[in-house]
């Protein structure tokens, strides 16, 4: 069961990578809502985007990703794996979300954003690294504590719903 749950986490991580790839398909400015305010302001100043477009893309990203990711993990844990009760649901949700978080931190942030030019926005190179050490600390903290909280909330909701 653990291997299956890890594979489901890899699947969620692959969905994240796919969403990012679609978001930057016409250039990284398409995902500038994920960058610091300084990078966003520079992109607006350079005429690459507008505050309204940044806001719209951010809302669209959240509207697609949050329900999509929640739906995916709930289908995996409760629909496919047949979890019953809080503990079974919680550990599976936590593993899936943690695997996705590791892929996000190491593959997306660490390698793709940090070591390739795919996420470079022309005219903002002087603002690199786009993900600072402080940003990384926050992401790691939220990724560990935050995913545990999300897993607990979803498991509690599903336990109440099922029983």
Language model segments and positions:
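Core segments of transmembrane alpha-helices
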Residues: 58-78, 139-153
């Amino acid at each position: 069961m653990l291997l299956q749950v890890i594979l489901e986490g890899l699947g969620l991580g692959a969905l994240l990578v796919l969403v990012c790839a679609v978001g930057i398909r016409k250039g990284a400015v398409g995902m500038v809502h994920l960058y610091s305010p300084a990078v966003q302001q520079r992109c607006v100043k350079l005429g690459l985007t507008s505050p309204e477009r940044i806001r719209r893309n951010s809302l669209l990203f959240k509207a697609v990703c949050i329900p999509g990711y929640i739906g995916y993990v709930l289908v995996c844990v409760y629909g496919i794996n047949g979890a019953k009760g809080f503990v079974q649901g919680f550990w599976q949700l936590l593993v899936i979300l943690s695997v996705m978080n590791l892929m996000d931190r190491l593959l997306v942030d660490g390698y793709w954003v940090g070591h390739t030019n795919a996420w470079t926005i022309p005219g903002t190179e002087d603002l690199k690294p786009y993900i600072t050490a402080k940003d990384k600390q926050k992401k790691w903290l939220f990724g560990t504590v935050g995913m545990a909280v999300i897993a607990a909330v979803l498991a509690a909701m599903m336990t109440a719903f099922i029983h």
